[in-house]
């Protein structure tokens, strides 16, 4: 039988992976599969190929069905189980997944050792205590320090193992202190809309609920608005199922990107993050005051809690408190912290209650 070979260069591991497929794939499917195996997201592939995200998503779903691949999380495993693959230069033949050891690879061949996880405290506006945290991943510099935590750095690519790694890190960090946390403490994990398609989010959420329960800790999935949210609208049933399992949803950077008022109407969000550009000049611009107040009042009527994200001055914090905003986050209160520093800050805050 004629075969098609796909060759992948894993630079971090000084290896080349060769995979042989039966001649059942078109040139477009071969190119798409190669990019998916390299860790490119649907969004990145759409830009490289000048195709819409929707088109690439549909092509990927058809490809996975043809190859009997369950999801992105199982892509490498399913490929190694069903097709012949081998590594160079070691020439390890592996007709099934269990007979080989493949390094864990995330986006574009980067290992998780290249990343740090940071926790930014979210404060209760009424009493000033830490009410939750925003969890993000930042890529390290060559010297081991972290890149600046701007939104372009911390929004990881969804088509990789970082989601599972992130959940594992959170479980390990909070398990020893879960009984010390105040009731309603919420942990916010940033994801992209296409993660609903490309990552086994629901499984990770259910495992989290199994470990921590629902009485003390709230798990919040926060959706980026940098890309279109049509995927969220398309998979509302999945979101509602997740929500019915006591996982909460948040809309990030409201007022920016693709965030629309209709999303508040059609998707069961419990939180919205009010982007700092919506209030950064609140002290000098009356129009900003009107817009921010309108968004806050609308959210209240929809029973959605507002998190003022990007507080830089005490006056901004005071303004938000006066308007009845429940939660505050920003460098005026605390910068994102490594895990150990965050836990120390959190436990110190709890002792003051």
Swiss-Prot record:
Pfam families: EAL, GerE. This is Uncharacterized HTH-type transcriptional regulator YuaB. GO terms for biological process: regulation of DNA-templated transcription. InterPro entries: Cyclic-di-GMP_PDE-like, EAL_dom, EAL_sf, Sig_transdc_resp-reg_C-effctor, Tscrpt_reg_LuxR_C, WH-like_DNA-bd_sf. Residues 42-61 bind DNA. The keyword Oxidoreductase does not apply. Keywords: DNA-binding, Plasmid, Transcription, Transcription regulation. GO terms for molecular function: cyclic-guanylate-specific phosphodiesterase activity; DNA binding. Residues 98-350 form the EAL domain. PROSITE patterns: EAL. The keyword NADP does not apply.
């Amino acid at each position: 039988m004629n075969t098609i070979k796909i060759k992948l260069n894993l630079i971090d591991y000084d290896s080349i992976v060769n995979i042989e497929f039966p001649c059942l794939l078109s040139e477009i499917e071969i190119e798409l599969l190669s990019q998916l195996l390299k860790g490119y997201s649907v969004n990145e592939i759409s830009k490289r190929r000048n195709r819409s995200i929707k088109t690439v998503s549909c092509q990927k779903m058809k490809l996975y069905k043809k190859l009997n691949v369950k999801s992105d999380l199982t892509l490498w495993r399913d490929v190694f189980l069903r097709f012949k693959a081998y590594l160079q230069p070691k020439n390890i033949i592996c007709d099934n997944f269990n007979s080989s050891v493949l390094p864990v690879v995330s986006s574009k061949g980067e290992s998780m050792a290249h990343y740090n996880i940071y926790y930014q405290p979210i404060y209760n506006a009424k009493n000033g205590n830490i009410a939750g945290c925003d969890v993000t991943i930042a890529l390290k510099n060559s010297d081991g320090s972290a890149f600046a935590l701007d939104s372009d750095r911390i929004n990881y690519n969804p088509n990789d193992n970082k989601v599972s790694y992130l959940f594992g890190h959170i479980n390990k960090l909070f398990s020893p202190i879960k009984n010390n946390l105040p009731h309603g403490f919420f942990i916010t994990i940033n994801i992209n809309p296409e993660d609903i398609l490309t990552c086994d989010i629901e499984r990770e959420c259910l495992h989290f609920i199994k470990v921590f329960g629902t009485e003390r800790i709230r798990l919040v999935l926060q959706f980026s608005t940098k890309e279109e949210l049509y995927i969220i609208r398309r998979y509302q049933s999945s979101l509602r199922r997740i929500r019915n399992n006591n996982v909460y949803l948040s809309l990030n950077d409201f007022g920016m990107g693709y965030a629309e008022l209709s999303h508040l109407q059609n998707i069961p969000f419990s939180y919205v993050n009010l982007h700092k550009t919506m209030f950064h000049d609140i002290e000098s611009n009356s129009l900003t005051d009107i817009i921010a107040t309108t968004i806050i009042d609308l959210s209240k009527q929809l029973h959605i809690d507002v998190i003022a994200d990007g507080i830089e001055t005490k006056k901004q914090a005071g303004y938000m408190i006066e308007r009845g905003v429940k939660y505050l986050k920003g460098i005026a209160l605390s910068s994102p912290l490594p895990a150990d520093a965050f836990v120390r800050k959190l436990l110190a805050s709890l002792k003051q209650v």
